[in-house]
């Protein structure tokens, strides 16, 4: 198995980790839940993308913005990491095709909107797959008190309880207080 710094170099082109990244990655690889609060531009995404490549199974990334999902998936696929997104921008046929490919473990990382988590079809898919990690990107959206709050984030806990084996949970934000 590749080491974390080898994954960093091969897929992201960096020689070394930034401050705080390796500690978060190590904790994830040791199967600990983590919360990463890092400034914008500090490399939060690498903190879950590197372990996602190294862990067996699929990493689900709960993300609030379709544009962010598309950007991340495009960047990952260009780097050679198979990734997809499941959100309202897909037609039903595209969604079904993406799920079918995911069932074959085509993807290491799948970005999903929080509204999708408890849908019957997605929940059924998630239960039959090996979900190694669930990552909450832009985790400040979980807070009921914030202006960015999305009620469906409250279903993450319920979603995790539905999994046959509890995945690692990671959450990242630049704006938690």
Question: What is each residue range found by the language model?
Answer:
Residues 1-39:
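Conserved pre-motif I regulatory segment
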Residues 30-36, 57-58, 106-108, 168:
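Pre-Walker A (Motif I) flank of P-loop NTPase domains
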Residues 31-50, 60-63, 172-175:
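Walker A/P-loop
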Residues 36, 61, 84, 110-112, ...:
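Hydrophobic positions in the central parallel beta-sheet of the AAA+
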Residues 42, 49, 90-133, 141-147:
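Conserved helix/coil segment N-terminal to the catalytic DExD/H
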Residues 52-54, 76-78, 100-105, 124-129, ...:
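Conserved catalytic network of the ASCE P-loop NTPase/AAA+ motor domain
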Residues 57-79, 88-90, 94, 113, ...:
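Conserved Walker A/P-loop ATP-binding site and its immediately adjacent core
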Residues 120, 127-177:
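Post-DEXD/H (motif II) to motif III coupling segment of the RecA-like Helicase ATP-binding lobe
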């Amino acid at each position: 198995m590749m080491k974390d710094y080898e994954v960093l170099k091969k897929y992201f082109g960096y020689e070394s980790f930034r401050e705080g990244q390796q500690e978060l990655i190590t904790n994830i690889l040791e199967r600990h839940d983590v919360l990463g609060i890092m400034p914008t531009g500090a490399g939060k995404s690498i903190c879950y993308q590197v372990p996602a490549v190294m862990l067996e199974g699929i990493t689900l990334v709960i993300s609030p913005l379709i544009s962010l999902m598309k950007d991340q998936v495009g960047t990952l696929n260009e780097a050679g990491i198979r990734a997809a997104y499941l959100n309202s921008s897909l037609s039903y046929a595209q969604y079904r095709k993406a799920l079918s490919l995911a069932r074959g473990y085509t993807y290491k990382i799948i970005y999903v909107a929080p509204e999708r988590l408890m849908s019957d079809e997605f929940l059924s898919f998630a239960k039959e797959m090996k979900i190694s990690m669930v990552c909450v990107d832009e985790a400040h959206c979980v807070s009921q008190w914030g202006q960015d709050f999305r009620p469906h984030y409250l279903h993450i806990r319920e979603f995790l309880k539905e999994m046959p084996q509890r995945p690692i949970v990671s959450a990242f934000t630049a704006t938690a207080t």
